[in-house]
Amino acid sequence: MRYNQFSYIPTSLERAAEELKELGFDLDLQKTAKVNLESFLRKLFFHYPDSDYPLSHLITKNDMDALSFFQSEQELSKEVFDLLALQVLGFIPGVDFTEADAFLDKLAFPIHFDETEIIKHIHHILATRCKSGMTLIDDLVSQGMLTMDNDYHFFNGKSLATFDTSQLIREVVYVEAPLDTDQDGQLDLIKVNIIRPQSQKPLPTLMTPSPYHQGINEVANDKKLYRMEKELVVKKRRQITVEDRDFIPLETQPCKLPIGQNLEIFSYINSYSLNDYFLARGFANIYVSGVGTAGSTGFMTSGDYAQIESFKAVIDWLNGRATAYTSHSKTHQVRADWANGLVCTTGKSYLGTMSTGLATTGVDGLAMIIAESAISSWYNYYRENGLVCSPGGYPGEDLDVLTELTYSRNLLAGDYLRHNDRYQELLNQQSQALDRQSGDYNQFWHDRNYLKNAHQIKCDVVYTHGLQDWNVKPRQVYEIVNALPSTINKHLFLHQGEHVYMHNWQSIDFRESMNVLLCQKLLGLANDFSLPEMIWQDNTCPQNWQERKVFGTSTIKELDLGQELLLIDNHYGEDEFKAYGKDFRAFKAALFKGKANQALVDILLEEDLPINGEIVLQLKVKSSENKGLLSAQILDYGKKKRLGDLPIALTQSSIDNGQNFSREPLKELPFREDSYRVISKGFMNLQNRNNLSSIETIPNNKWMTVRLPLQPTIYHLEKGDTLRVILYTTDFEHTVRDNSNYALTIDLSQSQLIVPIASN
C-alpha cells in the first residue's frame, strides 16, 4: 500500500479541536500530547465497557503495550506515535511491517509527528485511509459511533454516513419530456427510479443516466451484429460537409392535475456502489434509462440530443420546470418537494457519456458530473479516420446494434406487440444513416458529437479514464478535456487500467475527494478544498499517483524508424484468416510476437522518454492497389514489471459504504512481470489520409505522405527500454477484415515517430 492523499483539507488547530469535539472526542488543548492521545485511543474502543483491554492489544515498543505505556512516566515520542498510528489504521506489527520507519517511508505516510501538533495529527489520522480502504472516521461511523439521525454531520469537509439506509424511500415517477421520438403524437414519458433517505431537509441528487438499467436485449443485440469479413470499399473522391444544428424540444403545457400521493414503489434496482456511498451520506439516488427503455416511451435514438433531452427533462423536474406523473395514466402529477434541485451525474461508459452530453446543454441544476470512461464523439467510438472501427473487445458492434441492446421496451411483451413494427422502421432508418459502408463522418455522427458544444458546459466536471481502455479509447477524454471552457472547475484522473471503475482502489482516495467536491457543490459547504486539475497514475511503479498540469504537450521528439523499405502483405491464407476471424485474441497474440503480417521496428531508448499526448506516425507509404488501410500499435516491449490493466480484489467486503450497507471489495492494479504493454494504437483508411472530411484517391504504387495520429496517452519509458512500432493492415479486433491481395510498402528512411514529450 502507498498513500496518495488528495482529499485531506489542512486544518487549523482550533478547527481541528472543534470538529473532534463534535464527534465526541474529549480532547483539551491545555493537556499534554500523551494525555490527549490516550483519550483519543480510548474513544476508538467505544464498543468496549472497559477500554483497558483493547488498549493493551496495541504496542508502543517491542517490549511494551499501550496500556502500560500510558500508565508509565515515559514521554510520547515519534517512535511511539508512529507505531500507534499504524496500528489504529489496521497495520499489524510483525505481519505488515517489522521496521516502522522503513514502512512509513514505503507508505508515503502523510502525517509527520510533532508533539505540539497532536490535535491536528489526531484529526488527520481520522481522515486517513485504513488498510481496509476506508478512512478511520468512516470505519468508526460504520460501526455505530454516530447514530443514524437522518441529518448531516461533516468531518474535514466530508459528509458522514448518518442517514438510515434501512428505511429508504423507493419510488417511481414518470417525467414528461418535450419529445416524441417514436412519432406517435404523444410526448414521451421517462421512468425515474428514486432512492432517498427519510429526511426533513431538501436533498441533493446523484443521477445515473443509464440506458442499461431497465434491462438489455442481448438476443436482439447478437442477431444485429455485423460480419467483419468484407472488402474495404474504394470510395469516390469528395468533400464531406456537415452543419451544426440546434436541438429544438417540443412545447409542453403547464400541468393543472392534482398532486398524487400514492406512488409506484420498487424493492430493488442494480445500484452503483459510489451512489450507495453517498446515499448513506444524505444524497438521493435516481436511476434514469431515458427514451426507448422499459417503463418509458419513445424510440432509442442512441446518442443524439433527443436522448440527452430525455435525461435533461428529469433535471428540469427536480427544479420545478417539468411535469412528472404518478403513472402512465397521467391522472395525478407529482412534485420533487424533497429535492434541493442540485444534481451530479455519475456512471461509466454509456452512463458517463450521457453525463457529458447533459453537461453540454448547460441545463440549470446540473452542478457537477462524474463521468468515467465516457464517449465525447460517437464517431470516434465506432469509426476512426474513415474506417469502420469496432470498440475493443466488440468486433461487429455498431450504434444500431447498441440500439437493439438498449431498446428494452421490447422486453415487455405488450410494448413489443403494439410498437415493434414502428420500432423496426425507425431502427432501419438509423442503420442507413450511420453509413457502415463507407465509414465516413456525416451528419448522423455530427449530431452525436458533443465536442462542438463543449463551450456551453458550465458545471464542474470530473473525468476518469483508463489509458489501457481500448473500448472507450483515451482520445474521447483527451478531446473533451482540452475543449472545456477555461472558466469552469475541471478534474481528470488518468489511471493505467482498462474500462473500469476506480472508486474502490486502495492507492487513491477518489471516493473521499468526490465527497468533498459534492459537499461544496450540492450542499454549499465552504470547505476550502482544492483538487488538482489532473492526477495521473505513474506506470513505472505500483500505487503512485502524480499531479500533472496538462494532457498533451507541444514539445516533440522525432524518432527515426530506420533506412529500409518494408513490405506489409494484407493477404492471409484461408485457414489463418478464418482462425484469426474466429478468435481475434489469437491474432493479437501473433501480432505482438511478430508472427502476423506486419512491419516491425524496435527502438532501444538511450534516454528516458516521458510521453504526454498524441503520438503521430509520419510515414512514406505506397499501396499496390487503389485502396488500403493502415493499422499501428506502439509497445513498451521486453520483460519487466508493469501494472496490469484489470484491478484485482485485495479484500472481499472490507469497504462499508454506510453503516453495514452495500459492502464492496478493496481493489488495486497488480504490479507484475509481463512481456509487453500497448502504449497506443491507431487506424486509418488511406483515402482519409489528410482529414476526415476529405476523401482522396489512392494512386497505385505512388508514394504518399501519411500522418497517422495514435491514441493520446501519458506513459513514461526509461533509458534502456525498447519501444516497438508495429505497422500492419487488417486488425481482427477493430477493423473490417479485408483479405484481398494488396500490399503496403513503407519507406522507413522517410518516416518518423513524432512523440510529445512531458516537461519536467
Swiss-Prot record:
Annotated Gene Ontology cellular component terms? cytoplasm
Report the superkingdom from the record: Bacteria
Q: Where are the transmembrane segments?
A: none
Under the GO molecular function aspect, what terms does this record hold? Answer: aminopeptidase activity; dipeptidyl-peptidase activity; serine-type peptidase activity
Please give the biological process terms from Gene Ontology that the record holds. proteolysis
UniProt keyword annotation of Ion transport present:
no
Q: Which of the seven top EC classes does this enzyme belong to?
A: hydrolase
Q: Which SUPFAM superfamilies match?
A: alpha/beta-Hydrolases (SSF53474), Galactose-binding domain-like (SSF49785), X-Prolyl dipeptidyl aminopeptidase PepX, N-terminal domain (SSF81761)
Q: Which HAMAP family match?
A: Aminopeptidase_S15
Q: What role does it play?
A: Removes N-terminal dipeptides sequentially from polypeptides having unsubstituted N-termini provided that the penultimate residue is proline.
Q: How does it assemble?
A: Homodimer.
Q: What is this protein called?
A: Xaa-Pro dipeptidyl-peptidase
Question: What organism, scientifically named, is this protein from?
Answer: Streptococcus pyogenes serotype M5 (strain Manfredo)
Identify the gene encoding this protein. Answer: pepX
